[in-house]
Amino acid sequence: MPDFLFPNIPMPERQSKPRKRGLTMMIDWGLPLGLQKDCLEAQGLYVDEAKIAASIPRVMPKTYLKKKIDTYKADGIFAFPGGLFTELAIAQGNYELFLKDAKEAGFSGIEVSDNLLKIDPRKKKAAISKAVKEFGLTVMGEVGRKEGSMTKEELIADVENCLDAGASMVLLEAHELFHGDIRQEVLDELTKKIPLERIMFELPVVVLPDVTKAYKVKVLFWMIKQFGTDVNLANVEWDEIYFTEITRIGACGTTSHSQGAYRLAGIESSEE
């Protein structure tokens, strides 16, 4: 860990990298390499995973993509392409070729989702298993739809299916849980059955219609209050890393985190 100024202002401690919990996944919309390097020099200690989003790996020059992946890996960051790109490969019948290319590019793993493509649970399980067993890739399963929604029972069964197939962790699609009202009942039931360290909650992304930065921050505050500092969070933009970190430790202008810095300093919760 680096040295920090203000050593006389105590803060709640966090696990250092490589972390097993409290992971932060940064979403990369084609961040230029120079900015990526500056970003990681400043705040890479708070980034555990990086998703190069959507189908961006297909339109980025090969040598540049490899440099970006290598830069992440050099900082101990797990880099993988977005699940929508995987869905496109499956729909085209090019999944095995996609896995070969992902391996050749240097990605540590992939994401297997069914946001748009309706995949039979057995086929989804087979896709995850193939990537893990035949290609040695770490798989992030993803559960949830970008259009419509799943029942509580369907969502939990899908998470279990991904983990049974060999996924190291399951991402929960933000649209499924946080589009409009937060689906508290679904989250309560899910976290009773699945260990929190095997789940990563996506924050809403502001590139989607009707999603505002204010709403994303509201969801972030709620997640930390509900599940604590060590909840796994995805879809954090490069300029939100520090903000997310100080929110995790309850030092970001809200007293909602019972074990956060403000509350531990004796400041009463404004919600009580």
Q: What is the predicted role of each segment?
A:
Residues 39-43, 72, 101-105, 131-132, ...:
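Generic structural signal for hydrophobic
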